[in-house]
Amino acid sequence: MSYADQNIFLFMGGFFIAMAMQRWNLHKRIALYIVKFLGTSPRRIVLGFMVATAFLSMWISNTATTMMMFPIGLAVIFHAASMLDKEKSGINTAPGSFNFGLVLMLGIAYSASIGGIATLVGTPPNIVFAGIAKSMFPKAPEIGFLDWLKIGLPLVIIFLPVTWFYLTHIAVPPGISKIPGGREVIERDLRKLGKMGTGEKLTLFVFVFVALSWVFRRDIDLGFWVIPGWSGLLGISDYVHDSTVAIFGAILLFLLPVNFKKRVFVLNWEWALRIPWGIILLFGGGFALAAGFQTSGLAQWIGERLSFLCGVPTIIMILCICLLLTFLTEVTSNTATTTMMMPVLGALAVATCIHPFLLMIPAAMSASCAFMLPVATPPNAIVFGSGYLKIPDMARVGFFLNIIGAIIVTLLVYFLVIPIFGINALALPF
């Protein structure tokens, strides 16, 4: 049953939607419009790229997002360097010495990792947490798309501007006040895309339909008013989950015709095959591992060995977990690390009588906050290949951002998770 977990189908449906966006270049159009809207001064260009990258990373893989934003960013850097050289500004625009190139590349990589935290389908560690938490603690509150969005989106809204300010004002100031003709580069790429085609429009329709269906599937309590969920109104709330919506959206992509005469549909199997099937198999293995922890008694055994931590303040324990996961994923896969650590953290929660969400959620979030090394994440490796940054630069900037991220995640989880999920911090969901 571990390989048929609903969270696997949720992520699979999200992958299919992401493939459709990439096939018809919808993601590129969205990114270019965001960058164009946010302005053309060096700092605002960095902000535009970071917002666009983070938004796309909420829905498609951070690797695909970075691969798409990377050449656009390089085009802006090359244009800026060319114009500054023509004006004989005296600024060294060579790769490795051009601060604007360094900060833009770092901004793209870091925002790709941060953006994925916002949604349940944004990055694998989020889904790993949801699946293992459900397996180990079936009586705990359900973690659906909207539930995660309530904590993931606030984190991104706080962390992204903090990262932008840290990069552009403290760590790597661009060193230039304006980029002559910077807007033209973005407008040129938009002109190349042409008018929005049928494939893009249909993909956008399915994307919006699925996102809204996720958000409004269950009742939303605003305090003064309860918005009824569509699944309850239709009387099917016991049979419909977020994964149902995701797979239904994926089926629509295979059925909606772009050109019926030529048998061209929004998504075909050639593109569907490109989703990362290895990640899906890894999910199943992780959920099976968590079930093994429970049924074999290993979780209880680990919990008994960790009982000496009972006296440690909860907030200190959360911070230590955040720092551990952040720096551990600098040299290991965040998906594999999260899969390995979640059952252990579940056992730790039982041993210390702390609600497991307070330990497992920050671990999942922190697994996406490795900013120091090129090997830490695919986005880091991609931008490192530009030549505009060196390992010491990334390590110096990323070290302090790792610390900042751990602190932000700790505070947000400590003060938001309890009221949002309505849990008792010192009670186990048994």
What are the functions of these language-model segments?
Residues M1, T63, F165-P173, G194-L202, ...:
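Flexible hinge motifs at transmembrane-helix junctions and intramembrane kinks/re-entrant loops
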Residues L153, I280-A299, C310-F430:
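C-terminal transmembrane helix pair
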